[in-house]
Amino acid sequence: MTPTPDAPAAADAATGAGWLARRRGALARVALAPIAQAIGRVERVADGIAFVSGLEDTMLNEVLRFEGGVTGFAHTLDEDLISVVLLDPDAGVRAQTAVARTGAVLEVPAGPQLLGRVVDPLGRPLDGGAPLDAAHTLPIERAAPAIIERDLVSEPLDTGVLIVDALFTIGRGQRELIIGDRATGKTSLAIDAIVNQRHSDVICVYVAIGQRASAVRRVIDAVRRYGAPERCVFVVAPAACAPGLQWIAPFAGFSIAEYFRDRGQHALVVVDDLTKHAATHRELALLTREPPGREAYPGDIFYVHARLLERAAKLSAALGGGSLSALPIAETDAGNLAAYIPTNLISITDGQIVLDSALFAANQRPAVDVGLSVSRVGGKAQHPALRAASGRLRLDYAQFLELEAFTRFGGLTDARLRAQITRGERIRALITQPRFRALRTLDEVVLLKALAAGTLDAMSPDLVAPLRERLPAWLDARIAALTPALAPPRDWLADDAALDALAESVGELIERIAADAARRATAGMPAEDAAGDIGGAFGGEQARGDADRDADHGANREVSREVSPEASREVSREVSREVSHEADRDAAADAARVAGRAPGRAEPDRAVPRAMPDGPPRAQADGDRASASRPPPDARGDAARTAPSPQGGADANVNADANVDAEAEARHKR
């Protein structure tokens, strides 16, 4: 049954009064003012820069849309022209092309949907996945936290690299610069830090600026293989993309990381690298006719990098206590740290890790220069147990480097100095660490305690690599044996007595490794197989092939380091004694050579020595025997040079002369 309308409604429907009132209300809500949109025109375009006129009210960094769909952002604002940096290929952008404002600044999508994805600086997928949900976006240019909003950096950001965690600790919220020449392992060190966060609560953002596509692919594959890609975001602006995308890439990466920091989480940003970003900024500045300064960089290059890196901070507890750490990478030219961009970045950041090309060539990885590297947070963010265990590590290693330089003048007979050199060789073997072989904080503390106790002094440096590989499983087994059943979790790093016991047990592990290595050597098996078998016996881990495993622990490098005056004087006395002994032996050798020749006899031609009946030339044979088994320095003398020869007096003279030449060549090499 259809309901009957009431009387007033029926009357309105009959007269049309209600309809007229509704129409009048709708008309009152209509905006009758004209809607005008400013349209600009392209005056000229070249090299990814468009100069636009007619848009005087444009904001800095505002997104402009060209006819045909190409976008760009306002880079510089002049009275007559606006310099617009294109974010897409400039195909279709010509003179007199229409340009419209959007009223929005550059933004990038942010949120958990980015985790595990590879995107460009605008958030567009590069991995072939689905487009990202742009429900939550952040501007790429954001103000750095104020001083009152920050907290002290007091928590460590573990990298798993012993030399970094022990000597140059990085804290959560710190900015630590990684700087060095080309191909010295800068990216490798940063990727090791990312990979080590696979068991932590840190979100990692890797920003590639101007890198080769193949190099970026290797980085992504390494993180996917060894790390936790589901906790990483890759922002890629390769060398082939537009300069505008390369310029905004680090800002976009920081905005993505700030999303997690502002929600009480911890984030790490690796910018690879800021040297290429500075070159891109210089390119854009020169194209937009900005006045150049030092090394042709514009005057605001310091401000650009400062406002970027100041966004890394540890927030106060009132704001959630989140942190944003930064590992910017910079490249030097021939180790010149005094160049413009390196000095700027060193002054902006909270420390630097300097990688040396000579150490890298000597196969020391990571090639960290201990004398030039520093962390301005350091022990404030270091774990107390690790800080106590690494107290004298840097001083001992610096003194070893100077003593090692002295040993080139001759051997040292002082037992204390030899022990110090032995300790330094073990330190160098410990800090030489292959890629993707991260150590836990417990492993680092136990290794350093064993080093300080002298447990590692008696072992060969070649056994340090298998010791480092097998130590985690060894410690886990010891901890399991010391932990009662159903016992609550225990903080082993807070128990000094337990740490000392674990460090003492390292000696037993060293004995087993040495015995197994000796057995393998007797059987003629290569060292790599021995290390792999040791891993199977003690750690249950698979031996992983890596070229960095065979690091040369005996590489020498002269470095000027600070050493105590007493040690310097003692080393000088030792060197003087060795030099005087060498001079005495040289004089005796010359006298013996003169006495061994007949007066007036012409010196035989050493270029064509007399050949033995059934073998190589006698001089070569004697030289080989002398180099194969050379007597000690005190036993060398006239007897070694005047040994009887079955060939007679002439052959004796030839043999003596050959031995003297071998002696002189050996001394020259020393």
Swiss-Prot record:
Segments of this protein annotated with the region Disordered: 525-670
Required for activity (site feature) positions: S373
Compositionally biased intervals (Basic and acidic residues): 543-588, 621-639
Primary location class: membrane
GO-annotated molecular function: ADP binding; ATP binding; proton-transporting ATP synthase activity, rotational mechanism
Subcellular location: Cell inner membrane
Entry's EC annotation: 7.1.2.2
Annotated keywords: ATP synthesis, ATP-binding, Cell inner membrane, Cell membrane, CF(1), Hydrogen ion transport, Ion transport, Membrane, Nucleotide-binding, Translocase, Transport
Catalytic activity, as annotated: ATP + H2O + 4 H(+)(in) = ADP + phosphate + 5 H(+)(out)
Pfam families in the record: ATP-synt_ab, ATP-synt_ab_C, ATP-synt_ab_N
Keyword Cell cycle: no
Binding annotation for ATP: G180, D181, R182, A183, T184, G185, K186, T187
PROSITE patterns in alphabetical order: ATPASE_ALPHA_BETA
Membrane topology, from the record: Peripheral membrane protein
GO cellular component terms attached to this protein's record: plasma membrane; proton-transporting ATP synthase complex
Subunit relationships: F-type ATPases have 2 components, CF(1) - the catalytic core - and CF(0) - the membrane proton channel. CF(1) has five subunits: alpha(3), beta(3), gamma(1), delta(1), epsilon(1). CF(0) has three main subunits: a(1), b(2) and c(9-12). The alpha and beta chains form an alternating ring which encloses part of the gamma chain. CF(1) is attached to CF(0) by a central stalk formed by the gamma and epsilon chains, while a peripheral stalk is formed by the delta and b chains.
Matching NCBIfam families: atpA, PRK13343.1
Main function: Produces ATP from ADP in the presence of a proton gradient across the membrane. The alpha chain is a regulatory subunit.
Protein family: Belongs to the ATPase alpha/beta chains family.
Protein name: ATP synthase subunit alpha 2
Organism expressing this protein natively: Burkholderia mallei (strain ATCC 23344)
